């Protein structure tokens, strides 16, 4: 299977992710699952930079006649976040050809993965939840919804919600991401959820949120993730207005270390913004993976809908030139600019004007900024992702070598040997002084407990449950 060939190619209309208009793209579907789009028909198959590049492996396909006839949607789970891409073609026959070709490639890749796992000595990976239990608990009881108090809605989106919870037994706080099963079960295609939850379990880095448990109910999949209590970086920055360059260097280095780790695993984080950065009790960074928008934002003037925070969008995302790792370095540039300058590099309440600034405007700096800081931010905020600092083949190493980070020992960063410039005033992991008071005092009801048996699993769950074998997971053996 080393020879990757083209299965199907042709013109399709792709709907913009942020600015919801349709753009013509020439797409190639390949045997390795890559589905790549260009503005022009490529004369040379190995054009270096496709505008759109995603994989149809483990995807779900849906057909719809809205917002245009002959539309099809590709949906897949990236970590615990559901992402969708929308396309349309001129005729039902054309749509049928594309969807059949995509499904055939996805099915073949799935069979190959199953064969690999069956041959592999580590095929017990499916039992990862059981394997990785704390050896001291011989009769481990699976986690259920009844094991947690539900405190506050942290985020909400089309596919589910994220709730701050407290584990009753330990008093520890977690973020529980709850996805509706019906949006991720299409026919029998659920392998992607299982595979992605495995990726999350295997993702271990000191500055990334880790997965503590996962389990399922009748109609939901639940991911229970670390939630640190040193407060959001946004909260600390609002209180102090700006951070010193030294303090920013410390946080920036930890973020670079985490993104380097993700990129080495072929994962683009794509959602770096101040609100997704938290501090642990010692003052180290934690990048969250709660992955839900704070609801769609509608611009009344244009009726175009945005998901998330448009101020952080990279130029290539806005132009719908699908993006690679360099999108994360733009995000790093925006958050480090905010830390050192006390404001966003580009801002306008009117989204159309904001997008124009992001795409066209030169960046301005306060006079107080050092030349190294200006050089770093200028490099990270270059509009063209291929010329951006970190946009080359060396990725994070390019940023690590920049003079702003000279003197930083990157192994010490990873090992948490550097002393944090600020230590949150918390006494333990359950100290809630940086949480909103309104929700530490009360709980919220998510599901009427009587709907579940004592195991937290609905008795009527028989026909839905087999879709998600071995979904339960506990990380207690890995700490």
UniProtKB/Swiss-Prot annotation:
Posttranslational modification: Phosphorylation on Thr-305 and Ser-472 is required for full activity. Phosphorylation of the activation loop at Thr-305 by PDPK1/PDK1 is a prerequisite for full activation. Phosphorylation at Ser-472 by mTORC2 in response to growth factors plays a key role in AKT1 activation by facilitating subsequent phosphorylation of the activation loop by PDPK1/PDK1. Ubiquitinated. When fully phosphorylated and translocated into the nucleus, undergoes 'Lys-48'-polyubiquitination catalyzed by TTC3, leading to its degradation by the proteasome.
Effect of residue 305 to D: 2-fold increase of phosphorylation steady state level, no activation after pervanadate treatment
Regulation: Two specific sites, one in the kinase domain (Thr-305) and the other in the C-terminal regulatory region (Ser-472), need to be phosphorylated for its full activation. IGF-1 leads to the activation of AKT3, which may play a role in regulating cell survival.
Keywords assigned: Acetylation, ATP-binding, Cytoplasm, Disease variant, Disulfide bond, Glycoprotein, Kinase, Membrane, Nucleotide-binding, Nucleus, Phosphoprotein, Serine/threonine-protein kinase, Transferase, Ubl conjugation
Record's GO cellular component terms: ciliary basal body; cilium; cytosol; Golgi apparatus; nucleoplasm; plasma membrane
Disulfide bond residue pairs: 59-76, 293-307
Active site per the UniProt annotation: 271 (proton acceptor)
Modified residues (N-acetylserine): 2
Gene3D superfamilies the UniProt entry points to: Phosphorylase Kinase, domain 1, Pleckstrin-homology domain (PH domain)/Phosphotyrosine-binding domain (PTB), Transferase(Phosphotransferase) domain 1
Pfam family membership, one: Pkinase_C
Annotated positions of the Phosphothreonine modification: 305, 447
Binding positions for ATP per the UniProt entry: 154-162, 177
Protein location: Nucleus; Cytoplasm; Membrane
EC number: 2.7.11.1
Region of interest: Disordered: 458-479
Enzymatic reactions: L-seryl-[protein] + ATP = O-phospho-L-seryl-[protein] + ADP + H(+); L-threonyl-[protein] + ATP = O-phospho-L-threonyl-[protein] + ADP + H(+)
Domain PH: 5-107
One MF annotation (Gene Ontology) recorded for this entry: ATP binding
Reported effect, residue 171 to R: In a glioblastoma multiforme sample; somatic mutation
Subunit structure: Interacts (via PH domain) with TCL1A; this enhances AKT3 phosphorylation and activation. Interacts with TRAF6. Interacts with KCTD20. Interacts with BTBD10.
Family of this protein: Belongs to the protein kinase superfamily. AGC Ser/Thr protein kinase family. RAC subfamily.
Disease link: AKT3 is a key modulator of several tumors like melanoma, glioma and ovarian cancer. Active AKT3 increases progressively during melanoma tumor progression with highest levels present in advanced-stage metastatic melanomas. Promotes melanoma tumorigenesis by decreasing apoptosis. Plays a key role in the genesis of ovarian cancers through modulation of G2/M phase transition. With AKT2, plays a pivotal role in the biology of glioblastoma. Megalencephaly-polymicrogyria-polydactyly-hydrocephalus syndrome 2: A syndrome characterized by megalencephaly, hydrocephalus, and polymicrogyria; polydactyly may also be seen. There is considerable phenotypic similarity between this disorder and the megalencephaly-capillary malformation syndrome.
Domain commentary: Binding of the PH domain to the phosphatidylinositol 3-kinase alpha (PI(3)K) results in its targeting to the plasma membrane.
Protein name as catalogued: RAC-gamma serine/threonine-protein kinase
Organism per entry: Homo sapiens
Gene: AKT3
